[in-house]
């Protein structure tokens, strides 16, 4: 549980960020006439795969720019740090789906900054096609993918474009450089199958969809990759994270599409974790989880936005303000509800 001092630091930092960053996006009112098509990695052309992988590697080697995020040396570090800083606000909360949709937009910006051509769109991973056999997926190809399971006691990834990668952010709330580690467990990936996805998006309310997606295919997708993906704080250190969350975002979009008029406004849940619950995938609440991941120190707390920003209370609203800490302008939950609403302009193929 955060101390009174920590809460004070967070509120002070929130005021600072509110002054330094836009509180709403200007392009949300623009028209979406030709939505880009996001494809599963299975269906991305060889040339587009190469362009995407090269852009990711460019982000990983580009110097950091914000000069405020603890441990960040590169633009990729800043992206991972963003997830670390917001971890207790965007998991087991109503923010989970909208924030990760915004997070994908943040990645897209960084990739374009590194020269990713406009015609190459963010890929996702159609996980039902590989359910039960993740290790055989083209996602883990050694040339046109992200490399496979790691080796040795730490399961360090030693093949593919990201072999021998050093991850500077994490584990947990720490900043201890380590290898990119991954250990694929096929039987766990069975819970990402088509029947599980159908069940996850069968509910009639946002809360039902949120809970089912989070604790179902989302959670099992991470668990099936183990190691870094088992670290809910800094799992985005593995670039496969973003393909997985593209799949998660597609599930939400598919659920919304079933009753679009109603569901584009359906949002609910807390805007920060209940300390007694913490991450729903672990029992014991925050105090128990801190034994695994530690607690955010004052440096992290000093750059952590107010989880109630735009809401006026502890429940998330469409007015909730999401921050990338300066990588891209702030956005509201309302901005990201419609993937073809103007602020966003894409669809899933």
Predicted regions and their residues:
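Intrinsically disordered, flexible peripheral segments
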Residues: 21-349
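Fungal secretory targeting signals
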Residues: 1-26
């Amino acid at each position: 549980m955060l101390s009174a001092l920590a809460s004070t630091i967070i509120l002070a930092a929130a005021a600072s960020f509110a002054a330094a960053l836009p509180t709403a996006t200007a392009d949300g009112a623009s028209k979406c006439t030709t939505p880009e098509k996001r494809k599963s990695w299975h269906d991305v052309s060889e040339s587009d795969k190469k362009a995407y992988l090269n852009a990711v590697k460019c982000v990983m080697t580009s110097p950091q720019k914000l000069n405020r995020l603890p441990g960040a040396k590169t633009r990729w570090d800043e992206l991972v740090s963003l997830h670390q800083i917001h971890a207790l606000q965007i998991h087991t909360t109503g923010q989970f789906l909208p924030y990760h949709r915004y997070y994908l937009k943040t990645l897209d910006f960084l990739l374009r900054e590194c020269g990713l051509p406009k015609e190459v769109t963010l890929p996702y991973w159609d996980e039902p096609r590989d359910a039960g056999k993740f290790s055989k997926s083209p996602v883990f190809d050694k040339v046109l993918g992200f490399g496979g399971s790691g080796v040795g006691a730490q399961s360090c990834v030693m093949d593919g474009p990201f072999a021998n990668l050093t991850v500077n952010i994490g584990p947990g709330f720490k900043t201890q450089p380590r290898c990119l580690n991954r250990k694929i467990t096929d039987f766990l990936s069975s819970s990402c199958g088509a029947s599980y996805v159908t069940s996850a998006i069968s509910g009639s309310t946002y809360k039902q969809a949120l809970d089912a997606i989070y604790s179902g295919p989302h959670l099992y997708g991470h668990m099936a990759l183990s190691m870094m993906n088992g670290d809910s704080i800094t799992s985005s250190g593995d670039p496969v994270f973003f393909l997985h969350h593209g799949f998660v975002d597609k599930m939400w979009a598919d659920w919304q599409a079933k009753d679009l008029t109603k569901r584009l406004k359906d949002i609910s849940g807390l805007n920060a974790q209940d300390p007694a619950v913490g991450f729903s995938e672990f029992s014991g609440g925050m105090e128990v989880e801190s034994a695994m991941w530690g607690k955010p120190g004052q440096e992290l707390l000093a750059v952590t936005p107010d989880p109630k920003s735009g809401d006026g209370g502890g429940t998330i609203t469409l007015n909730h303000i999401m921050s990338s800490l300066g990588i891209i302008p702030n956005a509201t939950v309302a901005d990201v509800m419609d993937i073809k609403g103007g602020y966003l302009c894409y669809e899933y193929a």
